[in-house]
From Swiss-Prot:
GO-annotated biological processes: carbohydrate metabolic process; peptidoglycan biosynthetic process; UDP-N-acetylglucosamine biosynthetic process
SUPFAM superfamilies with a match to the protein in the record: Phosphoglucomutase, C-terminal domain, Phosphoglucomutase, first 3 domains
Cofactor binding remark: Binds 1 Mg(2+) ion per subunit.
Record protein name field: Phosphoglucosamine mutase
Membrane spanning residue stretches: none
Lineage: superkingdom: Bacteria
Keyword rRNA processing: no
This enzyme's EC code(s): 5.4.2.10
Modifications the protein undergoes after translation, according to the UniProt entry: Activated by phosphorylation.
Amino acid sequence: MSRLFGTDGVRGLANGLLTAELAMQLAQAAAVVLGHDRTTDGKRPRAVVARDPRASGEFLAAAVEAGLSSSGIDVYDAGVLPTPAAAYLVADLDADFGVMLSASHNPAPDNGIKFFARGGQKLPDDVEDAIEAQLGKEPQRPVGADVGRIQRFSDAEDRYIVHLLGTLPKRLEGLKVVLDCAHGAASGCSPQVFKDAGAEVVVIGAEPDGLNINDGVGSTHLGPLKEAVVKHGADLGVAHDGDADRCLAVDHEGNEVDGDQIMAILALALKEAGKLKDNILVATVMSNLGLKIALRDAGITIRETGVGDRYVLEEMRDGGYNLGGEQSGHVIFSDFATTGDGVLTGLQLAAQVALTGRSLKDLSSAMTKLPQLMINVKDVDKARAATDEGVAEAVAAAELELGETGRVLLRPSGTEALVRVMVEAADMETAERICKGLAAVVKERLGAPSELAV
């Protein structure tokens, strides 16, 4: 049987893989592993439960809360909140753990369940495995006064907003900001906190109806935000995804500013302020080489991790670093948050525009993105990608040709029978030539002929 937990909790089609029964069982299992097994003061364990606004979140949250309370866990029902807000509240309320119901940037029919440990930290693999192992066991069934109670937590969003405002190095008076909330969990708090910070705010994608989350808007569909920024003459635009754990931006001319560029701006700002721990940024192997070049010239070192914000978080925790993230817009400020926070990132980015008096376009020019091409080579034996001699020779030849002007990355998919071939070079013509050549070698050496998908 395959592992139930994926890279970001349990995720799937609501009422397909992710049923109310499974949600309740996961909650009962978590009640033991994260609650009773770790609580020694004789009090009932406490958990924060939050969700994004997709329709299935209503019945799944009800199932989770039933599973927790019937297992002797007191529940703070925080309602609709961004994922990072749920993590913050676990720490702020000194709860034993938290549960977030969201499928992030996925479409409305999907949903997911992820857990946070005490302090709002993501769970390591071994704790997720313990929860999964507990699924096959009889749940705890207290009676009478020992059952858990459910408390509606009406000021959850306000607590989060106050926290965010306290992180700003400068208020945002004089800035006009367009926010695209993806019809998601930040539809209420993101516009409010930007207004409270002093910005003039234009809002799109903030009318969630349970079915329109991520539908043509948000960080995976930047077209509407680009149009709105130019139309309204805004200084910048900020886009979230459905659960607001990521942020992409748009400058005043409608140009995209991705996660790498955002990290470059913020790393340089923190270093200048003397606040970048050990002058190190943590980023994944998928970050553009231009980020490393720009920061190297400024005396900042990049610690590279595997793909996924959980690996960025692990490296940050292990090294005590305070800034990290991904090209996709997951940016983690460990001084203020335990996970990627799109609202926090947008605020910090806008604050740099206000603080420096420079446009976002000018700030983002600190990094020159190298042309990048990725080809997914399908239907191959991905397990041999790292050991095949012919593939290794082709990669070595490509790296020799590129020298310090580019790089090559071969990455087997974690879920499909394919290998991703990524090449960065000084120009797109070179990147395309080398990438297609490597992809052909991978296909020839590791699989049967078929089309290459770019």
